[in-house]
């Protein structure tokens, strides 16, 4: 089961917060798990590349206060999103909310009251709550040759320089890096593997930018800063993919196109790129007018 949960909260007292709060939501999520099963929280905190969850930054109506701070008045509703891509982890998180372990969470030095947790919805029309399965994502994937995505929080890819071996952050929605990010997370967590090399070769040969409108943004995590991009990007598969219409696409290309559509939908749950557990890379596919697409 894949789940996207939105947790609605308000500060018990007036709160002063930093502009970047993904790491606070990350800490709050681990604390929620810790109250149910300390070992689960401990294992998630260990450094491994494909953790089965993401968090969003805190969302709400904030006012600037001083240099680099945000003011939230007591009682102001805010929300944050967790996506969970593992059945055992989902069961642990559900116990916290269903068994009433606590109605309070701490974000930094501030205490927030939980008012509700939304689990229903289909992720459409701006709704960030949804649930599905890996099987359903793949079975329901379309054969659209156009993909439109929006990157809501700063997104970056950690790439290695082939000459020096050094890693650096890449802040552009290169489709190959996007699909590499999604396919690696898929194969790490899904019971239905995708041939990553074949898919990425397909993407590299056939995908092009239709248009993009992005900006760079900085996330300040306190001890360090991270640059990323936000905005919209449209991709299109071209050449042999579109020639002759969908009825004449060869079987292998059809399979890859279906997988590409599935992964674009999967991005809603897995995020994109680097530090998705700290609020970066929040991504969702956008509806293309006149296609009936999601």
Regions found by a protein language model. Name each.
Residues 1-294:
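RNA-interacting cores
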């Amino acid at each position: 089961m894949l789940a996207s949960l939105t947790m609605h909260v308000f500060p018990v007292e007036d709160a002063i917060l930093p502009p970047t709060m993904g790491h606070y939501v990350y800490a709050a999520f681990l604390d929620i798990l810790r109250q149910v099963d300390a070992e689960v929280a401990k294992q998630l905190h260990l450094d491994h590349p494909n953790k089965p969850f993401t968090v969003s930054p805190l969302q709400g109506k904030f006012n600037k206060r001083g240099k680099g701070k945000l003011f939230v008045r007591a009682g102001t509703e805010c929300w944050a999103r967790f996506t969970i891509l593992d059945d055992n982890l989902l069961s642990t998180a559900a116990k916290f909310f269903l068994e009433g372990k606590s109605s309070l969470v701490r974000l930094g030095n501030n205490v927030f009251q939980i008012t509700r947790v939304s689990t229903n919805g289909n992720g459409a029309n701006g709704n960030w709550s949804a649930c599905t399965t890996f099987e359903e994502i793949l079975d329901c994937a379309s054969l659209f040759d156009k993909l439109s995505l929006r990157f809501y929080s700063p997104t970056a890819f950690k790439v290695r320089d082939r000459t020096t071996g050094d890693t650096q952050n890449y802040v552009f929605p290169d489709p190959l890096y996007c699909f590499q990010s999604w396919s690696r997370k898929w194969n790490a967590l899904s019971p239905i593997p995708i041939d990553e090399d074949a898919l990425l070769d397909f993407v590299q040969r056939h995908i092009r930018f239709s248009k993009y409108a992005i900006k760079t943004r900085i996330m300040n995590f306190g001890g360090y800063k991270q640059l990323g991009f936000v905005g919209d990007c449209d991709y299109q598969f071209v050449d042999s993919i579109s020639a002759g219409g969908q009825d004449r696409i060869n079987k292998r290309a059809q399979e890859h196109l279906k997988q590409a559509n599935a992964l674009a939908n999967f991005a809603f749950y897995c995020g994109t790129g680097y530090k998705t557990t700290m609020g970066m890379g929040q991504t969702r596919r956008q509806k293309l007018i006149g296609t009936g697409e999601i």
